[in-house]
Amino acid sequence: NKMSGSVDADYYKQLSEDKSKPLLNWATQSQTAPGSVFKVCTSIAGLDTGILGPGTAFYCSGSFNKVTPSPRCWRLSGHGTETVTTAIRDSCNVFFYNVGWNLACSKDGNYNSTYGTSIMQKYAEELGLATTAGIEIDEKTPHASNISSIQSAIGQGTHQYSCLNLARYVTTIANTGTCYNLTLVDKITDAEGNLVRDNSAEVSNTVDVSSTTWSLVHTGMQMAGETYAKLNQLGYKIAAKTGTAQERTTEPDHATIISFAPYDNPEVAVAVVMPNGYASSSAIETAANVYKSYYGADEA
């Protein structure tokens, strides 16, 4: 092992110059924009502030015309009328542009982007997304977007999170608001199996929103999960939300997914980030393999 004891200088130089960055802990140190997985946070912010209700609907024509230039939905022909659950399922940009706009206008009726992003940042922090996770090794500090309430609402703007942050975020969502400080070590035992140290995750905070809010976002994620064939065909009742995020036009989009199962009694949460992974289908396939491993399907 060239990394054990005295390190081979030439080998270390080779690793440090490798474009695949093998010395980087991608799960804790690499950050990307989250893309549409942030729409769950936007939904919670909208529902809890009263911007949204169970029946609140926005019409998606394919573009958001309250600002110029008008940002587009990923479905250029539009989704038609969307509520919060169907908007999570369909990942409708225009619905969430409206939420971002209305959050920014909620103070005095005038559009104030900084006010809108500050609300989303508050919920991102409470959900454990925009704060450090507390693990035993170094992690990079996450950043909640502070520009363009409209773009921030769909997970663009200046959001920067690691896969670790997304894992903590979806765990909080699955737990209906219990946010944990994450740990890599559950417990330490001696050679005879006697407990030396209990290192179970501790509660950081709880997110005080209504049961209706949790029910709506869980339903939206359940509906979304049922549209992802490689997850739905497993039969594990997986709730999920995917995302693709563009940071540079010269590089492929990032692919993300947050998920938990089973959606009616969660016991496992999975987050996947594929930097420059092109499309969310790549992240979905990886998540499916994690679930198959967890449930032992890959051993059958």
Predicted feature locations:
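Short, charged, low-complexity patches
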Residues: 166, 279-288
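Beta-lactam-recognizing serine transpeptidase/beta-lactamase-like catalytic domain environment
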Residues: 1-36, 41-275
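Short, gly/Ser/Thr-rich active-site loops of penicillin-recognizing serine hydrolases
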Residues: 195-202, 286-300
